[in-house]
Amino acid sequence: MINTRSQDIADISGIKFHIVGCGAIGSSVATQLVRLGGNNFVLYDFDKVEIPNVGVSQYNEQDVGLSKVGALTNHMKKINVMIEIEGIVDKFKYYHGDKDDILVLGLDSMSARMEIVKLLAKCPYKPSFVIDGRMGAEQYQQYIYDNITVKQYEKDWYSDEDSDPEPCTRKATSYCSNMSGSFISNSIKNIVMKQPYFKQIIFNFSTMILDKKKLIS
């Protein structure tokens, strides 16, 4: 087993993970979850890998021109060929899951995030948890929602025009994207293993300050 060293710490094998957006955040969390023992995934992204993606995501130059979903599937299968992956090369239009799954939002656009949350809120079997990761070059933000509603999400949402100059911009760094995957994977481990987790975290690389709020125990 590839997760021999972590299987007693994190048993996430019974969870289906939905990764919406397979760019910097999505590719990082997907590959880390595979290494941690995740074995059932649904990947959503309509875009293709471009050269700038190589510098901030889990892709390489051989992936350029491929769909992000296809390229990420290849990388995940190279880690563990036995995992199950459903790839949807399209925008998120409806939720392919049930109430016990976990969904990760890793998009660049705040408006796209809100549209997805509105779709999820209408689902009879929405995911048990939605983890919203937002990153810039030097700062990462993360919000966790259980039984998500639009009203709940609006409290932490802002428009693309009013967004912070850091999170969800075109600027990005490899270390911030890798750390985003680590934060999300750790939060998922805590949720699944019924350990305490923070519903909101903000980490700034320039100051190395981690701000944590709303501890759930």
State where each predicted segment sits.
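Adenine nucleotide-associated cytosolic modules
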Residues: 1-217
